Amino acid sequence: MTIEKLAMNSVMAGCLPEYFPIVVTGMLAVLRTEFNIGGLATTTGGGAPGFIVSGRVADDLGVSGVTGCFGPGYRANSTIGWALRLAIRNLGGAHPGDMDKSTQTWPGKLAFCFAENEARNSVEPLRVAEGFSADTSTLTVHGLRGVHYNNETA
């Protein structure tokens, strides 16, 4: 993986240039050995990384943590998440049906990036809880699985 190839995936995802530092940070985070992106990206359970932006950078770039932040309408959320997903697939080889063995997956695997909603948060910000100063911006990555849906119409 090179910075140029990561930039190509960001452009394909529609990222604005100012989003790229978050994309780089996200990729460095998922490539950490202890995160185990290989296990998450290739499981049959449909797991995916979720990216939580905390601090001023979220406001500066328009990463949303308010109502509807997981859906369409927030370019930063969608394109940062999509750029990281493209890189995992295109550069890491996690192609559906090949290395990615998800039997069924979920929309969050396409793009799952959002901001911490500090204004509505009743506890200290995540970055502070993790030992960073309040004036620092951070990106936290969690391995997530999607919804479980049962439809009984009989």
Language model features by range: what are they?
Residues 34-35, 62-64:
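Short, conserved acidic/polar surface loops in the N-terminal third of protein domains
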Residues 1-40:
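Amphipathic alpha-helical packing elements
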Residues 48, 54-63, 70-81, 85-154:
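A structural signal for small-residue-enriched, beta-sheet-centric alpha/beta enzyme cores
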Residues 32, 41-45, 50-53:
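Long, hydrophobic, well-ordered secondary-structure blocks that form the structural core
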Residues 39-42, 119-120:
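Short, structured secondary-structure boundary patches
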